[in-house]
């Protein structure tokens, strides 16, 4: 029924783009992906670990997917970043919330196009609160990449090294840390 309905809509409206709200992941299948874009992959937008897990798992297969955040906490916000992003805030009682929103949305805008690039996991998949989870998105066509590394709530390690993909030893790379504002240049290894 649903596939036929979408087929009818697409045949009747040549330029139509259908946004697939994935129904908690139940509508992420090849037939649905043929007919629609997965712009809302799950309603688990309040759980950073669920967001991270979805990004890790889907990015192997889908260049365009996302959800967003319901929080301006940087950890939570960044956990929902992807090739598509929606920010849902309750600003009714506190219009000053937009100051933080503008800052985080500027950060997202700077890296958003990279999320449709090549995906490289930098850790094993895990939902454990004691682990790190990290990945790299790379856009060789644009000469840019982004690394997201999340130290989960019960992890006591302040430092973790990751072997990045696609670096060349004779090229100097610019690295920027959104948390500290630190910018440095380093050669690949």
Q: Where are the regions a protein language model picked out?
A:
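Active-site groove signature of glycoside hydrolases
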Residues: 1
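Active-site-proximal substrate-binding groove within the catalytic cores of carbohydrate-active enzymes
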Residues: 5-185
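Positively charged interface segments
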Residues: 187-189
């Amino acid at each position: 029924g649903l596939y036929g309905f979408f087929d009818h809509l697409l045949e009747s409206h040549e330029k139509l783009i259908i946004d697939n709200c994935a129904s908690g992941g139940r509508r992420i299948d090849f037939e649905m992906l043929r007919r629609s874009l997965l712009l809302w992959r799950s309603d688990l937008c309040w759980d950073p670990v669920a967001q991270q897990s979805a990004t890790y798992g889907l990015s192997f297969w889908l260049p365009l997917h996302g959800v967003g955040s319901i929080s301006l906490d940087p950890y939570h916000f960044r956990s929902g970043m992807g090739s598509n992003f929606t920010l849902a805030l309750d600003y009714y009682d506190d219009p000053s919330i937009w100051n933080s929103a503008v800052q985080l949305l500027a950060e997202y805008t700077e890296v958003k196009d990279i999320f449709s690039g090549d995906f490289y996991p930098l850790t094993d998949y895990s939902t454990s609160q004691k682990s790190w989870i990290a990945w790299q998105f790379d856009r060789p066509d644009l000469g840019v990449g982004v690394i997201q590394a999340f130290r989960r709530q019960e992890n006591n390690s302040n430092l973790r090294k990751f072997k990045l993909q696609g670096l060349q030893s004779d090229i100097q790379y610019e690295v920027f840390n959104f948390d500290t504002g630190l910018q440095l240049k380093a050669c690949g290894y």
